[in-house]
Curated annotation (Swiss-Prot):
Required cofactor(s): FMNH2
Subunit comment: Homotetramer.
Family: Belongs to the chorismate synthase family.
This protein's UniProt keywords: Amino-acid biosynthesis, Aromatic amino acid biosynthesis, FAD, Flavoprotein, FMN, Lyase, NADP
Residue positions binding NADP(+): 48, 54
Gene: aroC
Cofactor note: Reduced FMN (FMNH(2)).
Molecular-function GO term, any one: FMN binding
Gene Ontology BP annotations: amino acid biosynthetic process; aromatic amino acid family biosynthetic process; chorismate biosynthetic process
Name of the featured protein: Chorismate synthase
Amino acid sequence: MAGNSIGQLFKVTTFGESHGIALGCIVDGVPPNMALSEADIQPDLDRRKPGTSRYTTPRREDDEVQILSGVFEGKTTGTSIGLIIKNADQRSKDYGDIADKFRPGHADYTYQQKYGIRDYRGGGRSSARETAMRVAAGAIAKKYLREQFGIEVRGYLSQIGNVKINPETVADISKIDWQQVASNPFFCPDPVAVEGFDELIRELKKDGDSIGAKLTVVAENVPVGLGEPVFDRLDADLAHALMSINAVKAVEIGDGFDVVEQRGSEHRDEMTPQGFVSNHAGGILGGISSGQPIIAHIALKPTSSIMVPGRSVNLNNEQVELITKGRHDPCVGIRAVPIAEAMTAIILLDHLLRFKAQCR
């Protein structure tokens, strides 16, 4: 199985399954002499881990990360950093009924057809549990970006179902209330929308159903020049990284799909001696960072693991009806915010190292 690594100079390789013994990753390319300990990584993992609020899956995992290599006397050595997280609350028996059945909307069918075998327990490698290691690696990238370049990578939830935040709360990137984002389980900058999210999720849990979501990632203080045209454009690599997150079905950079209705006179980001007048492009022009905040949005589908009966087939292509047991998120977008931040940080650090190697 290929496709387990991302990045060139800053490279992250993950391994492990949802109900396996452990999850792990190897992080290559971290510059030497950066202070690093588990305490630098754990806060982001705590933001992603399950069982932290009534709005997410009740599966309980401490997600305590252990650094296995690449750090000596509290500092990175420049060698590969090995990270591991032990699984503790698998409850694989919940999945016995689907051992020979394909959950509709999941990767069960495609994994079985491609490999001729699959780990049906919680989705195995296709489970979003794999993203814990992305968050761990991303925490390292975020620390280096922040300490060495002053780059901040942060995200927020902007929509669940038909409940949206007030656009005015995020109209000025520099005035987003990040303390408000950190203070609620929805990572939401709009306290009014938080109430709407709460009501919607309660209703969904009662119905045994799920819903989709939209979130935004913002990277501030990114220097001009990141990106390698033409095939390794910064926006192309960023879209690739964000699309690799489980359940993501669409990525927008800047104004995204709204550009369809804009005229050129409106969309172009005009310039003055003081700088850009607008940021419709989302901080990337011609595949290269412009120095403005990088803004990306992602849309996540509703999870297919629900209590509402659905039609599918088994390994013998016979019709079956499924109710997915187990513990699942009514909205996977809620815990996706730190994952999207991590993937953005990984791409930015990779491109920063490539920029320094080639241009300065």
